[in-house]
Amino acid sequence: MFERAVTVEYASLTRTGAPVTIPTTPYLGEDGRSIDVSTGLTYPAKAERARRDPRVALLFADPVGSDLRDPPVVVVQGLATVRDADLQANTDRYVRASQEKLPEVTKGQPRIVLRRLNWYYARIWVEITPLHMRWWPSRALDGAPGTWNAPEGTAAPLSDPAPNGQQPPAWITPPQSWRAVVEETAGRLSMHDLTVVDGNGFPLCLPVASSEPAEDGYLLHLGPGAPDIAPGPACLTMHTHPASFTGQENRTIVGTVAAAGDAIVRFRAERALADWSIAGGKAVVALRFLATGRRLAPRLKAECRRRFQAVPEVRFPRS
């Protein structure tokens, strides 16, 4: 499942200890000991949060595109190792791995065009060493979960040193109102995932069985096998994508949670985060992607300079 899943919910912690969860594509670590995700060098926030606080979580609960029938829901909590000391090697790995896992994304596109997209292919990798796992047969979370714990003393390698200078600012303006996100996604992005902070200080991401809009956010129904949720900061994520992963839609709202009954949680929304959603037909997706490139490409040289490295090239493996 870890190898074939197209998307995973990746949760990291802000400076204040609040969880932020973003859907991304998972890959098995090259040594088989970690589950890895990546983020673009030109939008490094997901990696920088993990560099500051390595406690992260992954939720495998979306089987679309995996060709797996009725896979279990798996929550992984672990320690992150951020890798950006060799940007060319990172880029080479991402080009190779993404072509193998998601061939439809670039099918039919000339290599000469793809080689110009180094603003996108230049990557920071986040290698996650699992410490704790829980799993259920389905998103319904029926019954107590299966559990696995890493051997005592398991540790993750240290992250590469943080680059000099300031992290680039956000490049997308967030929605002015979380209520607009609720209205816009109603009945369309119905798969919700909730992230809270566990008693051990790690993010904990869980699938929501069903949700009801409320005046101050949502009432979220979790399965009977869900762990108890303590009051505190929380993140609600909505996501959808076609099986070919030729587009995606993401929405994220942050706020707080409190218990509201048996397996029911009240999520009080505070604000919506900016999201990078590219949906529609192939032509629409291509145009939006090019527009994104015009905004992010100027950051590439600056981010490489911060790391005292050359701008990486997009190099495709020889057939």
List the predicted regions and their residue ranges.
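Short, basic/aromatic recognition patches
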Residues: M1-E9, P163-D193
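Short coil-to-beta transition motif at edge beta-strands of beta-rich domains
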Residues: F2-R4, D53-V56, R188-L189, D228-H239
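Charged, gly/pro-rich active-site loop segments
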Residues: D67-V181, H221-S319
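Short beta-strand segments
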Residues: A5-T42, L58-D62, P71-P72, L189-G223
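Well-ordered, non-transmembrane segments within structured domains
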Residues: W135, A140, W148-A156, S177-D216
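Residue-level detection of beta-strand scaffold positions
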Residues: T7-V8, V56, R123, R266
